[in-house]
Amino acid sequence: MDNLTYEKRLISKAARSHTPINGSFELLPLCNMNCGMCYVRLSRPEMDLQGHLHSAAEWISLARQMQKSGTLFLLLTGGEPLLFPDFKTLYLELRSMGMILTINTNGTLIDETWADFFAQYPPRRINITLYGTSKETYRDLCHYEDGFEKALRGIRLLRERNVDVKINGSLVRSNSTDVDSLVALARSLDAPINIDTYMYPARRERSAAFCEQSRLLPEDAARGKVQFEKASLDSKTYLQMAQTIITRVSETPDTPEPDFQRMRCQAGRTSFTIN
């Protein structure tokens, strides 16, 4: 039985007992990049108007309560979590509690010191989002021209130390032509990749017309998803997947939606987020 199967069994058991096994700490809204589609990021002045960061001690206190309640899997995210003061102190304390840690980061801050730290105290996985495969895309979308080379360097430093890395992508107007090159890059780095095509409305774009937002039109998002599947799967697997979807759609009766459907999402059942 592989680790993923064990995890699914644990989550299934947690759902039956209403155990909060899976948590997420959104440590801060601050980030060294400024992506157009981001719905989390605040500048320091914007954050100060709304509140302040929790201290490492406050997060640790919360984590102890979570540990007693059965939390095992914990995601550390942001903003950019590596900007959080005392990140290493918090990380090591969470690790000592037996929590299985995953980190979401843009990867641009990872240097030899960070890479050595994660090699010595490895997380379950570090998810690094690549927003494109060129400095031009990072300049236009993230307003950080050096971001691509820095993120790429961070991934390589981690992989050289055998730290588990997964590459995530966020498909928007500015990088919609980068799907194939992102998949090829992930292969060259020996890292799995997933590209999300649905973006939440960005706080700064909510008053703009849809055509002026970073998000793709639904039809374009669907095309991007198909393009990603086609680029990342071998032809036989892709055709099997496509046929399965076609069969499922063609055999689904055209009936009205029921008044109530059981919620499949685990939010509030086995998972939660604290910011």
Language-model region placement:
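Generic short beta-strand
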Residues: 99, 271-272
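Radical SAM enzyme [4Fe-4S]-AdoMet core and its adjacent flexible, acidic
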Residues: 131, 136-267, 271
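Conserved alpha-helical substructure of the radical SAM core
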Residues: 1-116, 120-125, 224
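A structural signal for isolated positions on well-ordered beta-strands in alpha/beta enzyme cores
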Residues: 75, 102, 127, 166-168, ...
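Generic anion/oxyanion-binding catalytic loop in active/binding sites
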Residues: 48-51, 127, 140, 168
